[in-house]
UniProtKB/Swiss-Prot annotation:
Annotated binding of NAD(+), by residue: 35-39, 84-85, 118, 141, 184, 297, 321
Superkingdom of source: Bacteria
Name of the protein in question: DNA ligase
Positions that bind Zn(2+): 415, 418, 433, 439
UniProt cofactor(s): Mg(2+); Mn(2+)
One cellular component term from this protein's GO annotations in UniProt: cytosol
Annotated gene: ligA
Length: 674
């Protein structure tokens, strides 16, 4: 047997195993391998495919990792129009739809009317084409007639199979040997939160749907892969037997390896439909993803064809959207807050009201344009709303209830922190304070960001302490922190010798934080944690980074022209040389550490959690050992946790890990992996 034949057999076996474990992990939530073990299988496959490039195929699981750059997304025609559904916002409208369909079916002599109720995912609709079971095209809905070809990006979504089971496909597909699957790409709550945590405050997404829509149109499929999106399938076309009922098509999709949402139900009466809608009005909050309603579809596919569609939507389906949770309140005041980058954000102070299980007394108004759009005045009665995981917001002014003593809200003219005249750049919706170097609120914001957990992690440097340090003129930039003296700290409110010593120890410890973390801590506009990592690898010292041209920066992965310009502007500030001098004198890490040859990458891509006390390492050192070897350390257990290291007296996290089937290792086993 030749080497290439042996390699082909090994590759085929690895692909089957990887796809099986991918399905177990992402679709069935029943993982059999840790992230580390799964990555080892994938590494074996990638190694073999590199040795035998002639055996690499587009449907290989190795192609999920992304990396291709797509300069444009060509338009493609849909085989059948991808129509949007009619929306209903009341049970009455659902009943009208049900009765309308029943009358139309009665004209065809049909008495029984089966409807399939499915949860409505708040995602982005896409179409997938499989030729002989292999994914050959993935496209957005677009205008319904044609969409954008985003195949490379969709291949990175773990719950989209790249190859369908051959025997089953052969038995199901029609003469064209092409199956079309439609559904929604979405982002689970946990993945959405993780993505936002890695981004600067000003670049965070408002909700999972916005994050999904933006991610699918990125040109770098490697970045798309890092954003961990999911797919739910609800449409199957191209079958040998096109009379197959919809409920059976959902079952076939599951057999083909797709996630179908699991919670669909066949309903025979209007009462059963109303029960389903009422049941999931509350239960949906417990799901790991956002749903915003229920979709009802006629189960009988041939009769769907007879009912047809309007220009915009099918007559055989409807989407019922749950109303957002709302409450009435009174706008008592509007405060204008200053962010660390100078942006002025209006905040509504509301009469406290209970909404979605918590008391709400404040809500962001985003910018002054929003105040004008809502027509808000002080003392107005307003409707506030909470939908999904989104922060409560003011959605409507009750003009008919406006009191006689209502007062207009005047746009800000001067910074509420430093008094500097505000500016509103052309094409910008927000006012901003240009007094970057002297504005106390901006200085405080930059210091708190510098000390935050994902930056320099100076836990003793809290809001109240920073407020005092800035007010007394002891600190004007992060560099000043490292020159504080114990007597200076002891003079502050609620500060004794012990507290002062703790602060100085925390500052001393932060000097060891990596160059990558320092870059993030500096608070450069648009530079989040992921971008800081790319910068630290491409420019392994602060001197190399500040000497790089805008064109050079724009070629770094994850760095476009906007981010590149922001970096150039940051280092061009008059205050930068002084800050750099302080950071050098304080002996912070201004360059990446030389890679240690003996350090392996055994934890590459593995998410590790520590619980209990370790004998040989403190928690910080153990975490650094994982990070040095390519892993990631988290503070809570989930299905995506790759490994839990259990020390002495582990807490409830160990129980949760066992319940979820997460791999648990002892300190000895952990040390053996290093």
């Amino acid at each position: 047997m030749t080497d290439i034949i042996r390699a082909a057999e090994a590759i085929a076996q690895l692909r089957r195993e990887i796809e099986r474990h991918t399905h177990l992990y992402y679709v069935e939530a029943k993982p059999e391998l840790s992230d580390f073990e799964f990555d080892q299988l994938l590494d074996q496959l990638i190694t073999l495919e590199r040795q035998f490039p002639q055996l690499l195929t587009p449907d290989s699981p190795s192609q999920r990792v992304g990396g291709a750059i797509t300069r444009e997304f060509p338009a493609v025609q849909h085989r059948e129009p991808m129509l949007s559904l009619s929306n209903s916002y009341s049970i009455t409208e659902v009943e009208e739809f049900y009765n309308r369909v029943r009358k139309l079916l009665a004209l065809e002599g049909v008495v029984e009317q089966e409807m399939v109720a499915e949860l409505k995912f708040d995602g982005v609709a896409i179409s997938l084409i499989y030729q002989d079971g292999i994914l050959v095209r993935g496209a957005t809905r677009g205008d319904g007639r044609q969409g954008d070809d985003i195949t490379a990006n969709l291949k990175t979504v773990a719950t989209i199979p790249l190859r369908l089971e051959e025997t089953l496909v052969a038995a199901l597909q029609g003469e064209e040997r092409a199956i079309e699957v439609r559904g929604e790409v979405f982002m689970r709550k946990e993945d959405f939160e993780r993505l936002n945590e890695s981004r600067p405050d000003e670049d965070r997404f408002a909700n999972p749907r916005n994050a999904t829509a933006g991610s699918l149109k990125l040109q770098d499929s490697g970045e798309v892969a890092r954003r961990s999106m999911s797919f739910v399938a609800y449409y199957l076309k191209g079958l040998k037997d096109e009379s197959t009922p919809h409920i059976h098509r959902l079952e076939l999709l599951a057999r083909l390896g797709f996630f179908t949402g699991d919670h669909y139900r066949l309903c025979n009466t209007l009462e059963e439909i109303n029960t389903y809608i009422a049941e999931w009005a509350e239960k949906r909050w417990q799901l790991p993803y956002e749903t915003d309603g229920v979709v009802l579809k006629l189960n009988d596919v041939p009769f769907r064809e007879k009912l047809g569609a309007t220009a915009k939507s099918p007559r055989w389906a409807i989407a019922y959207k749950y109303p957002a949770q709302q409450a009435r309140s009174v706008l008592q005041n509007v405060l204008f807050q200053v962010g660390r980058l100078g942006t002025i954000t209006p905040v509504a102070e509301l009469e406290p009201v209970l909404l979605a299980g918590s008391t709400v007394s404040r809500s962001t108004l985003h910018n002054f344009d929003e105040i004008e759009r809502l027509g808000l005045m002080l003392r107005d009665r307003v409707i506030i709303e909470k939908s999904g995981e989104v922060i409560p917001k003011v959605v409507r002014t009750l003009f008919e209830e406006r009191p006689a003593d209502a007062m207009p809200i005047l746009p800000p003219t001067h910074c509420p922190s430093c008094g500097a005249p505000l500016v509103r750049p052309e094409n910008e919706v927000s006012y901003s304070c240009p007094n970057e170097e002297e504005c106390p609120a901006q200085i405080k914001g930059r210091l708190l960001h510098f000390a935050s957990r994902n930056a320099m992690d100076i836990q003793t440097l809290g809001d109240a302490l920073v407020e005092q340090l800035v007010a007394k003129g002891l600190v004007k930039d992060p560099g000043d922190l490292y020159f504080l003296q114990e007597p200076q700290l002891e003079k502050l409110e609620r500060m004794g010798p012990k507290s002062a010593q703790n602060i100085l120890r925390a500052l001393e410890k932060s000097r060891e934080k990596s160059y990558e973390r320092l870059l993030y801590a500096l608070g450069i506009r648009h530079v989040g944690r992921a971008t800081a990592r790319e910068l630290s690898q491409a420019c392994p010292s602060i001197d190399l980074l500040r000497e790089a041209s805008e064109e050079q920066l724009a070629t770094i992965p994850d760095i476009g022209p906007v981010v590149a310009r922001s970096i150039i502007d940051y280092f061009a500030k008059p205050s930068w040389p002084h800050l750099l001098e302080k950071l050098r004198t304080a002996a912070l890490q201004l360059s990446a550490s030389e890679p240690k040859e003996q350090v392996n990458r055994n934890f590459e891509g593995v998410t590790v959690l520590f619980t209990g006390s370790l004998e040989r390492y403190d928690r910080q050192k153990a975490s650094e050992l994982v990070l040095e070897r390519g892993g990631r350390v988290v503070g809570s257990v989930s299905k995506k946790t790759g490994m839990v290291v259990a020390g002495q007296d582990p807490g409830s996290k160990l129980q949760k890990a066992n319940k979820l089937g997460v791999r648990v290792v002892s300190e000895d086993e952990f040390e053996a992996m290093l």
